[in-house]
Structures are given as C-alpha cells and as structure tokens.
C-alpha cells in the first residue's frame, strides 16, 4: 500500500477532476488520503476557475485577433487623484492569448502580489512603454490632459508600434485604431497588465520621494490625501512634488503668499 506521502506526490501530477486516479484513490479509506484528494480537487477547480476568468478578460483581444490584429496594446494610468507626485501611464503589448495567473485590475490584486505579477508581465510582454508626467505639468494643463500626455508618451515607447489600442475609459488623438473600455482594467487583460505596470512604477517612485521628503508618508499613501499626509502638509508645508492646483494644497500655497 502506498504511503500518504507517495499518494500526495502522485496527486500533484493529476490535472483533471475526471481523472481515473481519483476514482482509484477514493477506495482508500484512510482519512489522510481522503484529505489529500479533496485538497487536490480544490486546487484543480481553482485553476479551472482562474483560467475561465482570464479567458473572459481576453474577449476584446479575441475580437481583434479575428480581424487579423495581433499587436494590441493595453493602456492604463495611475495617479490622477493624489495631491503629490506624477501621473504614470503604461502601455503593454502581450503575446497572443497570453494568460498571466493572478493578473487583474491592480486595485484587486493583493499588495504583496504586486511585484510578482509586475515581474510576470515584464517577462512575458512583447513591449512595455511608461509615461510619467510630473506635478508641474499637471498644474499647467490639468490632470485630464496630463493623463493623456502620459498615455501618449507610454505608447510612443512601444516597439513594435501597436495596431490597436485598448484604453481604460479614454480616447486619444492618435492615428491608431482604438477601443475605449469602461472599467477596462477589470475587463481586458492587456489593460490589466498596463494597470499593474503603472501602479508598481508609481509606487516605487513615491517610495523614493518619501526618502527625499520625510514626514508625509509618501511610501505608504503614494501621495493620496491620507490623515498622515495632511498632517505633514499642515506641519511642514508644501514640497516641490505637490500639485498646487489641487486642494487643500492650493489653499496652503495661497495662504502662504498672503501671509
């Protein structure tokens, strides 16, 4: 009779719920064996569910594949709402039918998994472009226009250049066919890939700024208006990376000028 350890090793090789190996092993009454069978079945079901989820997020890409297009870039941005730091956009071209386990809208990925999935995108993408527009430009042109500039910069870095753009809720004035998708980072794997690249890139930048400008908790809040950030603004004032067109930074700058 096989040991439970041997059965556990055998079960790792089983990839289908209908496998005859399960039927054979289920005759073994040992509780340890039954526990390992249940565990392996749950793992297989989880893999099937994940594959279905990833398939559903390729629906836009597959429609474009049918048209003979393969160089499809997903575009997304991070950092529209913060009081400090740049807006960062990423453009990512994934290989045809590429599925990266765990890839999703970056807001839905556990923080501890960000770097792992970011690295998987880096490893598998055909091309990645990143656009970074700083707070000074944001203050000059407004955040919406700055976001478009960041996206255009990211796209310009792609090589090869894309045949079609899938963009999260935006249209760009570019001579490339494009589809604007509401909640694109949750509905397109290409956009989700851009989402995690932009997110990790910006988070790392804000960690660097945290070293330069201590007291605002940038490493944790990424420039968003948390209690610690607002406390830092009140005590220490405005830094060179703050967006002076955003409240309450704007009022602090005006108050300083008037005093």
UniProtKB/Swiss-Prot annotation:
Query: What's the domain of life for this entry?
Result: Bacteria
Q: Name one GO biological process term.
A: DNA replication, removal of RNA primer
Q: Name one GO molecular function term.
A: manganese ion binding
Q: Catalysed reaction(s)?
A: Endonucleolytic cleavage to 5'-phosphomonoester
Indicate the enzyme's highest-level EC class. Answer: hydrolase
Which cofactors, by name? Mn(2+); Mg(2+)
> What are the binding positions for a divalent metal cation in this chain?
76-77, 168
Q: Which Gene3D superfamilies match?
A: Ribonuclease H-like superfamily/Ribonuclease H
RNase H type-2 domain: residues covered: 70-258
Report the InterPro entries cross-referenced here: RNase_HII, RNase_HII/HIII, RNase_HII/HIII_dom, RNaseH-like_sf, RNaseH_sf
One of its Pfam families is RNase_HII
Subcellular location as annotated: Cytoplasm
How the cofactor is bound: the record states: Manganese or magnesium. Binds 1 divalent metal ion per monomer in the absence of substrate. May bind a second metal ion after substrate binding.
Is the keyword Iron-sulfur assigned to this protein? Answer: no
* Role this protein plays: Endonuclease that specifically degrades the RNA of RNA-DNA hybrids.
Q: What is this protein called?
A: Ribonuclease HII
Originating organism: Streptococcus pneumoniae (strain P1031)
Q: Species lineage, top-down?
A: Bacteria, Bacillati, Bacillota, Bacilli, Lactobacillales
